[in-house]
Amino acid sequence: MRDLVRPLGGWSTPAGRGYILLAVMTLAFGFALNTSTTVTTNYFTDVLHFTGPQFGYITAIREVPGFLLIVVTALLYRMSQQRLTALALVVFAVGLVGFVLATGFWSVVPWVILGSLGFHTVMQTQYALGMNLTEESRSGRVLGVMAGITQAGALVGMGAVFFVFLKWPQLYHEVFLACAVIALLGGVAIFGFPHLHEGRPLRVQMPRQRMVLARDYRYYYVLSILDGARQQLFFSFGLWVLVSHFGMGVSGISLVVIVSTVVAMAFSPWAGRMIDRRGERWTLSAINVAYIVALGGYALMDNLWLACAFYVLYSFIAPFSPIGAATYLRKIAVPQDIAPSLAMGVTLMHATAIVVPVVAGVILNFVGYQVPFFIGCGFALVAALVTLRLDPRRQRSAARAALDDAAAGATADEAAGCQAVGA
């Protein structure tokens, strides 16, 4: 239990209760999202009878709500983060139930949009909630543990799918309904999350901005754009290469994905601690070098076992880029800017995630499968150069610097008062 982050004041405090509720929500969300995603492709093929082009269309449609997330959060900016998360999980659950009602491509599109809107919102708000649980210097640890819990939920979901479909290969509707129920349970849990800042309770929720696009946060935006482009390239073509080029079957693909999930689950807390201990500049630079190794190896090493190893390496480090970017943002932004800035980051990430894979797919028709991975190496190289410029202390926004100076002044006055009383 060494990796478990003890909340400020212990488990009986509001921070401890919030930690447990967020962990329950994260586990439920990880299970529901990954279980439903695991069976969706087969469901579209076996039940809705999608054609090849329709898979491409539905993939693009599914990413659009992520691009529009900033609009949604701007409209609901008065809603607390915990209630917004609970609402998003309800929307996600409704989308999953809609899958059961669909009979073809056009009838499933509205439900895909709803489900995507729900899970993209949760993916943003859970970072903001996690960072509220503790002080700034421990943000990476909390987010790392939550990433591990997400992977644990995914692992349980993949195991459930494997054993259920081994005996009942057409049980799609029941799986989607079960995932919807689990998502709703996660929504119930997070609804009770307390209002916190730095792990300490607030009487009322902290106000936040409707929308934020500030020059002070430019490095966070750039990292989000590069991360979205690289990430979508790999996950669009990574498994496809294992299947089409190396001829790997369903059982082999399942094993690779399970190994990747187990490794990520085991090492996520450690990676979060490294972000806190060594800082974002060092950690994100190392992660981007690892991306270059994984993507370059995937393109250059024409060997199935090495390709699987590079896939596992990439999948293991993939969650840590957004965690490092989020902790960097927390160090330079005022509290009311963090949630809308995270939403802006997701929007920018999806702007590239929609465009880049399509362009790479067109290029792929004329050249070898290696090209998307070389492009991904280029994005990782640029990101590595950007991370070398990160210096949270010097890059704080003017409002954040003023807030820190005021807090330091108040602390100094309090210390002086204590000394005077002692004298």
Language model features by range: what are they?
Residues 1-16, 193-228, 404-423:
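Juxtamembrane intracellular "pre-TM" segments in multi-pass secondary transporters
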Residues 38-53, 236-252:
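Short amphipathic helix-loop junctions that connect adjacent transmembrane helices
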Residues 68-81, 165, 267-279, 364-365:
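Helix-to-loop junctions at the C-terminal end of transmembrane segments
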Residues 84-98, 180, 282-297, 374-377:
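Structural signature of the two symmetry-related core transmembrane helices
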Residues 121-134, 320-333:
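Intracellular juxtamembrane helix-capping segments at the cytosolic ends
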Residues 143-159, 348-356:
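Glycine-rich segments within core transmembrane alpha-helices of 12-TM secondary carriers
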Residues 161, 165, 181-201, 383-391:
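C-terminal membrane-cytosol helix-exit motif in multi-pass small-molecule transporters
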Residues 163-181, 362-380:
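A membrane-interface helix-boundary motif in multi-pass transporters
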